[in-house]
Amino acid sequence: MSKNGTTGNKKKKTKLSTAATIAANIAKANATLNNNNNSNNNSNNTNIGNSINGIPSSLPPSVTLPVEELISFAPECLLFSQLLEFEEKLDASINKRLIDIQEASRRNSIKNIRTLRLSIYNTYSNQSAYYHLDNKSLNSVQERPSWSLRVEGKLLDESQDELVNKSIKSSSSSSSTANKRKFSSFFKKVFIQIGHRDTCEWDKSQTFTETDGFEIKRNGNQEVDIKILMYLDHVPQKYKVLGGLSQLLNIHTDTKPRIILALWHYIKSNTLLDAETKKITCDENLKNIFSLEELQFNQIPQLLREHLSPPDPLEFQYTLHLSGDAKDYEQAYDIQVEVDEPIFNPNPTMRKEISQLNDEINHHIQKVYQHKRKREFMEKLSSDPLGFLNDTTANLVKDFQVSKSTTSTGFEEERHASFYYQPMTEELVKNYLSKQTTPNPTPQQISMAPSTPQTP
């Protein structure tokens, strides 16, 4: 018995020491987070309770434990509540950092320049057997000659992004392709002209799914020239600078804030701003562009509208080939596109893992509640068995009465005989009996009274 008692004490001491260690670590982490938060309180007052960039918030506020009720027999529940508080502070600190980085990226337009390789080719079928057939013969054939035009693309030089993504993702194979952008996401409109009469148009605003390429299928056996116009989807919106303003600022296509900033640098470098009146005196170049002698700085955005236009589309010429190998006629082009930093991309793998952990925690918390109710049941039964059984039976009877009573009078009234001596009872019984149909008597069941003999 002494050995068992010693072993139990050792287990209890080990358990308490582990709990104390966890509590100490939580206290240290809380102190560190408090210091960091206090130093950054003035940096941003944005609401950080919501999830940022697809990172799910940890546990919902409803997932808590009744610490006051459990601490008497399960002191470890206090550690769980402390972990929840620590997790909230950790999420708040991370979200603050993400917001700061996002605001800095918006101001500085942090983008990665990547190379998008565009491939244009076509395939064909049922062409060789129709060289010597006229139009009437073609109409009589079931399998008509056809061709398909394919426009595809993929990003090159993905090694750098993959290294960054691997540092923030798990080692699963699916995570390496989770955040790859689709080809159609880089364009907002694609216009294809086939010959002189046939045209096709794809608009990003009218579609809900992204694709890895575009395919056009047509029936025919003639080689035609195809013109492809592709409009890049710039985020933020970019504009083409027209005329003399483009030569003055040495800008062809850029965002409106950058164009205004370049114009402001030109004004400052040439000392065209009057410090007293805050007006800009136009030199010969600005006079030729804006046709004004002087202007206010707040007039610049409105004046720029006449000198900005949507950027030019990417134009490609392709000739349809209906003989030979398709790879021999494939055309490839490299396009420079802007891609966001990998840190801002949502991480589906991490979100799924966090969601699974949250579900597991919720499952265990529900088990804790179940065991708590069982313990309360057993505790009441052990303290006052008779009274507890009487209370439980009374509650069950009430539930049974509510579930089985189908009339509006109540279950208790129907238990007394006086309920059935009411005037309506006789009427209800008569109605019930009148509805009962009696079977028709059969010929064998009909009894005839003997006839009386007639006297002559």
Curated annotation (Swiss-Prot):
Pfam families: SWIB
GO cellular component terms listed in the entry, alphabetical order: cytoplasm; nucleolus; nucleoplasm; nucleus; SWI/SNF complex
Entry keyword set: Chromatin regulator, Nucleus, Transcription, Transcription regulation
Locations listed in the record: Nucleus
Keyword Thylakoid appears in the UniProt entry: no
Self-association state and partner proteins as the record states: Part of a SWI-SNF complex.
Function per UniProt: Involved in transcriptional activation and repression of select genes by chromatin remodeling (alteration of DNA-nucleosome topology).
Similarity field: Belongs to the SMARCD family.
Name by which UniProt lists this protein: SWI/SNF complex component SNF12 homolog
Organism: Dictyostelium discoideum
Upper taxonomic lineage: Eukaryota, Amoebozoa, Evosea, Eumycetozoa, Dictyostelia
